[in-house]
Amino acid sequence: MQNRFLESITQLDKPLANALVPLLHDQFCGHIDASQFAGLVKASGKTEQQVLMDLLPIAAALANPPISEFYVGAIAKGSSGDLYMGANLELPGEALFHSVHAEQSAISHAWLSGETEIVDIIVNFSPCGHCRQFMNELVNGSKINIHLPNQETQTLAHYLPYAFGPSDLDVTVPLLCKREQEFNCDSDDPMIIEAIDQMGLSYAPYTNNNAAVVLETNDGATFCGRYAESAAFNPSMQPMQMALSNLIRNNRQYSEIKRAVLVESSVGKITLVGAAMDALHAIAPIELQHMVVEPLLG
């Protein structure tokens, strides 16, 4: 079991803890598939709702908040029945807008794993306005069930009434929908190819600046992040932050990063290079490789 879970596992009832420990192996990054979750529920003797709440300390153990020292864990449950944990991330010494919220982390975890709809969000503290707005960007976002400790389950529409969202800006294909934009790639570099593939899956309906980041560690492993925009603009999730959240969730260290690539569209109304460089340079002494590529028409 990973050391980061040693304290949180003690907060669980023994039957659930015993069933969960084998899942917390070195490769565990917060993903529990539907069959594994069913096994945990059976072993615990509790309801699904109770087990989801019990798992929140495990999700919070994925956090990296050097500024606030306030650990928030979240779990996104996909329509597949799989669970995707996420936690807050703060960059040391950097402006607070670089932070990743736990709900964003969990949602991005699900998105990168191929989920096309989130049906439940479980979180140990009430979602802030930023996160409520980000969730409203998702497929059927207003219908997502929000589960909080000691509170009645309510939909996002309850927490974000009279919401402003994608439809107000004539966007009919929200975040998590299956979509792919193809881009020109004349490189045989596997990392560049991966970045362009991820870029094609990014979500940028307001700026057309499809973008992605790929980080490579010393052992050759790669961790990606896609750009995910919000109709409210400010809650948009940057690809560098998503990649860093992905890295930390996988129990890797910033010191392991040896290469970082940002690719973005040539037809975008903005560029993310400045924001990506600021975030990267806060945690690793390496240069950002930046590429601008053209979309394939047709």
Curated annotation (Swiss-Prot):
Binding site for Zn(2+): H101, C128, C131
Protein role: This enzyme scavenges exogenous and endogenous cytidine and 2'-deoxycytidine for UMP synthesis.
Reaction catalyzed: cytidine + H2O + H(+) = uridine + NH4(+); 2'-deoxycytidine + H2O + H(+) = 2'-deoxyuridine + NH4(+)
PANTHER family, alphabetized: CYTIDINE DEAMINASE (PTHR11644:SF2)
A molecular function GO annotation: zinc ion binding
Residue numbers binding substrate: N88, L89, E90
Domain spans labelled CMP/dCMP-type deaminase: 47-167, 186-298
A Gene Ontology cellular-component term: cytosol
InterPro entries tied to this protein: APOBEC/CMP_deaminase_Zn-bd, CMP_dCMP_dom, Cyd/dCyd_deaminase_Zn-bd, Cyt/Deoxycyt_deaminase, Cytidine_deaminase-like, Cytidine_deaminase_bacteria
Family: Belongs to the cytidine and deoxycytidylate deaminase family.
Record's subunit section: Homodimer.
EC class: hydrolase
This protein's name: Cytidine deaminase
Gene that encodes the chain: cdd
EC number, as in UniProt: 3.5.4.5
Biological-process GO terms, alphabetical: cytidine deamination
